[in-house]
Amino acid sequence: MLQPEGLYALEEGTALTASRNDCIICYSAYDLSVHLPRRLYCGHTFCQACMQRLDMPAHEQHWIPCPQCRQSTPVPRGGVTMLDLDLAAFLAVKAEREPSKIEPRSSVPLKISTTITQQPAGLYPTLGPQPHFPQPGCCCWGWGRLCWYPPGNPEV
């Protein structure tokens, strides 16, 4: 059956499109070891394994031509592993791989009609006893000598 060229291209394009967390060359999902997402100077991102295959020596300088736009990126002295990570893709992969570190909330639900007057226990550490600083007394010499000391002061 013949299909319109635009529709076929659209269906084919959607079938071949990689997700944001996949390398568009090898279609492998980015990971935290071999397939780290590395960014070229042009801004396109590919996995580290594919970048190493694209590394080509030319005139004693190593260059990586971008498979999408053909802009060449010089390879740093440490090799492909020294290229910048695509931070957004890296953090997305890291978030998928690591278990959630959020502490579970208490299983006791708050009633809507309950008035909250204190912080829930365990949210903030207690500071312990607070230091007591002596408060100076006050003397005024205007209409006569008027002195007072704060309550609990031993000078009274």
Curated annotation (Swiss-Prot):
A Pfam short name: zf-RING_UBOX
PANTHER family (alphabetical): RING FINGER PROTEIN 224
Alphabetized UniProt keyword annotations: Metal-binding, Zinc, Zinc-finger
Origin species: Mus musculus
GO-annotated molecular function: zinc ion binding
Name of the protein: RING finger protein 224
Family annotation (InterPro entries): RING_finger_domain, Znf-RING_euk, Znf_RING, Znf_RING/FYVE/PHD, Znf_RING_CS
RING-type zinc finger span: 23-70
SMART domains in alphabetical order: RING (SM00184)
